[in-house]
Amino acid sequence: MKFVDEASILVVAGDGGNGCVSFRREKYIPKGGPDGGDGGDGGDVWMEADENLNTLIDYRFEKSFRAERGQNGASRDCTGKRGKDVTIKVPVGTRVIDQGTGETMGDMTKHGQRLLVAKGGWHGLGNTRFKSSVNRTPRQKTNGTPGDKRELLLELMLLADVGMLGMPNAGKSTFIRAVSAAKPKVADYPFTTLVPSLGVVRMDNEKSFVVADIPGLIEGAAEGAGLGIRFLKHLERCRVLLHLIDIDPIDGTDPVENARIIISELEKYSQDLATKPRWLVFNKIDLLDKVEAEEKAKAIAEALGWEDKYYLISAASGLGVKDLCWDVMTFIIENPVVQAEEAKQPEKVEFMWDDYHRQQLEEIAEEDDEDWDDDWDEDDEEGVEFIYKR
């Protein structure tokens, strides 16, 4: 299936149902009084994370999701039925962004996690709600409020422990093939990898980690050169980055300059990503003899001002790969993921307020108090129906 990691959709919650103006008419009950029921609340729109999905391709074709409107109230104090909710299932790792405000509404990081993205409208009040000691035959009601409407950007971000960085043809895909069962395409030309891929590295029956391979970066990627830097977002949740450097590039480029290009593009994309733990890994040492490879790696590290440990491996032959993987496993065990607090669901939507109905009733009561001595007829059935809007 085609890998799609971005999609824009429209979500519209249901409007609230209107209240009803009605009076009880029954034999032998001359003054039945008001019996208009309230409307039903509008349906909500929810996001739900599903671990069985791995792409957003479905939302390239289906872009609009609308919840059901609440039914209007009816006579005999019948309340309208609440509108049905709509649930949109997305892959685990999806970030939901409100395109109107640029606000991140939530990150779907766990299977079954739900996120409210559009709140349904409040129900309107029937005329029964407006009955008082001075207004026995109210002809007032309120309409339901509109449901929330948002344009959302969905961004799928892979969940991995380790991320691979490097220029095209640095050997990232060869490495992930060597340490996991993943089989990304490998060839001797740049940009063989076009989409991110995941591989599970199993060290033993109880220890494993997930590694993410993304397309290579080149100079100017931040400005859109090559495949750009859009895939770097898949590394944001990684705990450590493996920066693969081709120790002896076949195209004759300078490994030091290549490494600096990667660092520069990281900083242009995100300072947070640039400050993540990053390990220097020199690949393709099988092309040189051992002493020459060690001397060249040391010279490159010094030129980069690298003072931490670095690794020499050959992904093709497996030389040094196992030791690197065990060190990564140890790092992951010693640095467990700090569970971020789940984003709190907003209890209100901007145009909603919890005391909406209370305010409506207070306003009607004030008007009734002002007009308490006006002439009015309880049996007048031809009066005007009042609709209060907010």
Curated annotation (Swiss-Prot):
Residues 127-147 are annotated as: Disordered. Changing residue 25 to A: Slight increase in accumulation of pre-50S ribosomal subunit. It is an enzyme of class 3 (hydrolase). Changing residue 216 to A: Increased sensitivity to HU upon overexpression, supports normal growth, no effect in mazEF/relBE or tonB deletions. No effect on persister cell formation upon overexpression. Changing residue 173 to N: No effect on persister cell formation upon overexpression. Its cofactor is Mg(2+). GO terms for biological process: chromosome segregation; dormancy process; negative regulation of ribosome biogenesis; ribosomal large subunit assembly; ribosome assembly. PROSITE patterns: G_OBG, GTP1_OBG, OBG. It comes from the Bacteria. Pfam families: GTP1_OBG, MMR_HSR1. Changing residue 80 to E: Temperature-sensitive for growth at 42 degrees Celsius, defects in chromosome partitioning. One of its GO terms (molecular function) is DNA binding. Residues 162-284 form the G domain. Changing residue 193 to A: No effect on persister cell formation upon overexpression. Keywords: Cytoplasm, DNA-binding, GTP-binding, Hydrolase, Magnesium, Metal-binding, Nucleotide-binding, Ribosome biogenesis, RNA-binding, rRNA-binding. Its main location: cytoplasm. GTP binds at residues 166-173, 191-195, 213-216, 283-286, 314-316. Residues 341-390 are annotated as: Not required for 50S ribosome subunit association nor 70S dissociation. Residues 1-159 form the Obg domain. Its EC number is 3.6.5.-. Disruption phenotype: Essential for growth, it cannot be disrupted. HAMAP family: GTPase_Obg. Monomer. Binds to the intersubunit face of the 50S ribosomal subunit where translation factors bind, protruding into the peptidyl-transfer center, leading to significant changes in both ObgE and 50S ribosome structure. Associates with SpoT. Binding to 50S ribosomes does not require SpoT. 50S ribosomal subunit binding is enhanced by guanosine nucleotides. In the pre-50S ribosomal subunit interacts with assembly factors RluD and RsfS. The C-terminus (residues 341-390) is not required for either 50S ribosome subunit association nor 70S ribosome dissociation. This is GTPase ObgE/CgtA. It comes from Escherichia coli (strain K12). The gene is obgE.
